[in-house]
Regions:
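Conserved, structured C-terminal
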Residues: 1-16, 104-324
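Acidic, proline/glycine-enriched N-terminal capping motif
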Residues: 1-91, 96, 221-222
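Well-ordered mid-protein domain cores that form the structural environment of catalytic cofactors
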Residues: 71-130
């Protein structure tokens, strides 16, 4: 069995009381001493920091690079201008989802692409098969995400001029505490946020700089899951990867349940007639909703909002409704 990899922030996580867990070949923080619920609420009320160093970061730069990558993106028909970025889905020639991604056009035919750590091998295989020549920057660049209503204020307190920060759909090269950084706007959790990519040798410097503002808290994988679930964000979900990208977007919906029990991934959702109409891709209690919720895949199409459903949650039948 291969040895688990660690991010440059491992020791900082341990110092802050993180519970570390194995995930797709990495050891990452599940939650910190405050607990996942408090971390979730901190992201919604102030700001939260996320260790994204395990994610894949790639530069794709050669004549015709944008045209080559366009055909691999679900929203590839929509042009990007230099300095722009967007969330997208990498897919193969058959339209099958390979990985969610964020793609930034740094300059003409010069792209910076990030994918979740769970999907790096599949993304690299796709790039190779389509002759999208790439350079992996994952070992050389660290990435810290910050999300929440005080994200912008945090970076301003770190010395960045507010007018220099990227707006929605933008990526910029900025200086942060004397270091050059690729900073991309991000709204993955339905909160304003930024992904900050910088020299991995200076991870402690940037981590300390952000925490010294006394605004953001560090948050782990558990909070990431519930924040993304509430926001309906498509993540690196094993159930959805390998399905048609169009179906991933058109046939998935949020289902909320009464109480705190949520059905787990793979559990079938039944309608009032007892017919299986969906499968849970991920489920959890969501602190922001104050109830359990699940992201579900409806192979025959999403029923009307408010449609009642029920499912088994660890031996207990739970009732829910389809969200809007």
């Amino acid at each position: 069995m291969a040895e688990l990899k660690n991010t440059p922030l491992r020791e900082f996580h341990l110092e802050m009381g993180a519970k570390m867990v194995p995930r797709s070949g990495w050891t990452l923080p599940l939650h910190f001493s405050e607990g996942a619920s408090d971390e979730h609420h901190c992201c919604r009320s102030k700001a939260a920091l996320f260790d994204l160093c395990a994610d894949g970061r790639y530069r794709i730069a050669f004549p015709g690079a944008w045209q080559c990558v366009q055909k691999l993106l679900f929203y590839g028909e929509n042009e990007l201008q230099p300095g722009q970025c967007r969330r997208d889905i990498l897919m193969n020639k058959e339209g099958i989802a390979v990985a969610p991604c964020q793609v930034s056009l740094m300059a003409a035919d010069d792209l910076f692409v990030t994918v979740p750590f769970q999907c790096t091998a599949k993304a690299e295989a796709l790039f190779q098969s389509e002759k999208a020549e790439f350079v992996s920057l994952s070992e050389y660049l660290a990435c810290i995400g910050i999300s929440g209503p005080e994200s912008r204020k945090t970076l301003v307190m770190c010395g960045v001029k507010e007018e220099d920060l990227p707006g929605e759909g933008e990526t910029k090269l900025l200086e942060l505490d004397g270091l050059r950084a690729i900073v991309s706007f991000s709204q993955f959790f339905d909160e304003e946020g930024f992904e900050i990519n910088f020299n991995a040798e200076c991870t402690d410097q940037i981590w300390d700089l952000l925490l010294e503002t006394d605004l953001p808290w560090p948050a782990g994988l558990a909070a990431q899951e519930t924040l993304a679930l509430e926001a309906g964000s498509f993540g690196a979900n094993e159930f959805l990867i390998s399905r048609p990208a169009a179906d991933v977007l058109a046939k998935t919906a949020l289902v909320t349940f009464e109480g705190r029990r949520a059905p787990l991934a793979g559990v079938k959702l039944l309608n009032e007639e007892g017919k299986e109409i969906a499968a849970v891709t991920t489920g959890a209690y969501c602190p922001g909703l104050e109830r359990a919720a699940a992201w579900a895949y409806f192979p025959e199409g999403i029923p009307e909002a408010g449609t009642p459903l029920h499912a088994d949650a660890s031996g207990v039948t739970v009732s829910g409704t389809v969200g809007e």
